Amino acid sequence: MSDQYVWLLWSSAFLVPWGIIYISFPAHRRAMLWASLFTTPFGLSEPLFVPEYWSPPSLFDLALRTGFDIESLIFCFGIGGIAAVMYNLLTHRVPVAVPANERERPLHRHHYKALAAPFVTFVPLYFLPWNPIYPSIVAMAVGAAANILCRPDLKWKTGIGGLLFLIYYALFLVGLEWSAPGYIDRVWNLSALSGINIAFMPLEELLFAITFGMYWAGVYEHFTWRKC
């Protein structure tokens, strides 16, 4: 397979389980769609990572020519909705509204500060002399911690959700290496990373997966005042 279309096919592959779950579990559709619509715009951050983190051949060579690409939007849409509902699918729980009296608790005074934490964290860290994947990982970890501090009831969902998404994402990395052998070596800027791989998977990809899963596992409930 030509490397030109690998990123498109791999990002689109995330839409398959998304679609199956969306159709099969109507009770989780709102959370999935909400999360995916919020994560999709993060695909526009691709110029921050090309070529510092990786240089994926893309449709019309957009990534290499402009930093932007269509595939990143597809990718961000596909992973957001799944990360938001994996824990709920495992536990067979559906989020319900938080009672009004609970919203008045002292911890919830920091509701919006907690939600803003990863974005506030990322900006100053981005300007440090390191690869942009690292401030992304730290920012999501801070966001996950802030979610738990503000909403302690989300601690299990955050932790288990992160592990579930790590496993899910690792399976997609396996599929990527199987369908396009050597693609990770050719496309990721491995010389600019830690050099630590788990099998063929860069440690940074796995750290991205677990922190992304931890943060987005609880954002829907936190932002919309719901709980499982």
Task: For each feature predicted by the language model, list its residue ranges.
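Short aromatic-rich membrane-water interface segments that cap or initiate transmembrane helices
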Residues: 1-3, 61-78, 191-207
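A generic, lipid-embedded transmembrane alpha helix
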Residues: 37-57
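Membrane-interface helix caps and helix-loop-helix hairpins in membrane proteins
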Residues: 1-2, 123-133, 151-152
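Membrane-interfacial, low-structure loops and terminal tails that flank and connect transmembrane helices
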Residues: 93-112, 227-228
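Alpha-helical transmembrane segments and their membrane-interface exit regions
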Residues: 41-44, 139-150, 168
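Membrane-interface helix-boundary motifs at transmembrane edges
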Residues: 22-34, 96-103, 149-159
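Hydrophobic cores of alpha-helical transmembrane segments in multi-pass inner/ER membrane proteins
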Residues: 10-19, 73-89, 139-145, 204-220
